[in-house]
Curated annotation (Swiss-Prot):
Record lineage: Bacteria, Pseudomonadati, Pseudomonadota, Gammaproteobacteria, Lysobacterales
Record: residues binding S-adenosyl-L-methionine: 200, 220, 229
Entry similarity comment: Belongs to the class IV-like SAM-binding methyltransferase superfamily. RNA methyltransferase TrmH family. RlmB subfamily.
Name of the molecule in the record: 23S rRNA (guanosine-2'-O-)-methyltransferase RlmB
EC number: 2.1.1.185
Species this protein is from: Xanthomonas campestris pv. campestris (strain ATCC 33913 / DSM 3586 / NCPPB 528 / LMG 568 / P 25)
Keywords, sorted A to Z: Cytoplasm, Methyltransferase, rRNA processing, S-adenosyl-L-methionine, Transferase
Entries under HAMAP family matching the protein: 23SrRNA_methyltr_B
Main location: cytoplasm
Disulfide bonds: none
GO CC terms in record: cytosol
Length: 249
């Protein structure tokens, strides 16, 4: 696993980090003179957990927040753990025939990636796989959007997605790619065993090579006039169909 220091800003993101990932929080910055009770709560909790807290001016917070609205608070801490590709095999084995792996083929918008991770954590996935290149990374925006989910599930960054898919298949993981033109419905396939759900990025969807490595393609039936869903919405729909089947098994 690898980690690097980064800044997280915003009340909810910092509060979640202090509550759920205190061991990795290096320090908390709070706007001097603020009377916001939420900031007081964050400061008190951080101090209880032994985290350094500094009161700073707005300019200092602007400097670490960049273009993201900081709401008077920021935290410096080790980024979410990124699991190595060779650790994925052990995660699948530990699931004992019921692995649920989410594979995201080039989701570039950090807000979408964060929303996908949040759904993945809620669904209890075994791991989320993302490419190291041509994909959003688990940065401050992703962590804020994920509401702490990036800390709770293994996110595996891989150099070669096609090779990773082949390795999953060797472990008995059946790969279903989501594609609007597919003939089979998501609701017609068995998602109860070792399953990998593969979704493409914004715009182009699954890349050709990724499609070729899927064992089957499925679609979400949409009787309305809209032909596609946002990738984070499609991820939630797909994951929770798997959850529904598994809970009913």
């Amino acid at each position: 696993m690898s980690k690097q220091n980064q800044w997280i800003v915003g009340v909810n993101a910092v509060a979640s980090s202090v509550e759920n990932d205190a061991d990795n929080v290096r320090e908390v910055l709070i706007e001097a003179g603020s009377k916001n009770p939420r900031l007081t709560e964050i400061e008190e909790q951080a101090r209880r957990k032994g985290i350094d807290v500094r009161r700073v001016n707005t300019q200092a917070l602007d400097g670490v927040g960049g273009q993201v609205r900081h709401q008077g608070v920021a935290a410096r801490y080790a980024a979410a753990r990124l699991w190595a590709e060779n650790e994925l095999e052990g995660l699948v084995e530990a699931a004992q025939g019921r692995a649920l792996v989410l594979i995201l083929d080039g989701v570039q918008d950090p807000h979408n990636l964060g929303a996908c991770l949040r759904s993945a954590a809620a669904a209890g996935v075994t791991a989320v796989v993302i490419p190291k290149d041509k994909s959003a990374t688990v940065n401050a925006t992703v962590r804020k959007t994920s509401a702490g989910a990036a800390d709770r599930i293994p996110v595996v960054a891989v150099t070669n997605l096609a090779r990773c898919l082949r390795d999953l298949q060797k472990q008995g993981v059946w790969l279903y790619g989501l594609a609007g033109e597919a003939e089979a419905s998501l609701y017609s396939v068995d998602l109860r065993g070792n399953v990998g759900l593969v979704l493409g990025g914004e715009g182009d969807g699954l890349r050709r090579l990724t499609r070729e490595h899927c064992d089957g393609l499925v679609k979400i039936p949409m009787p309305g006039d809209i032909e596609s869903l946002n990738v984070s919405v499609a991820t939630g729909v797909t994951l929770f169909e798997a959850v529904r089947q598994r809970l009913g098994a």
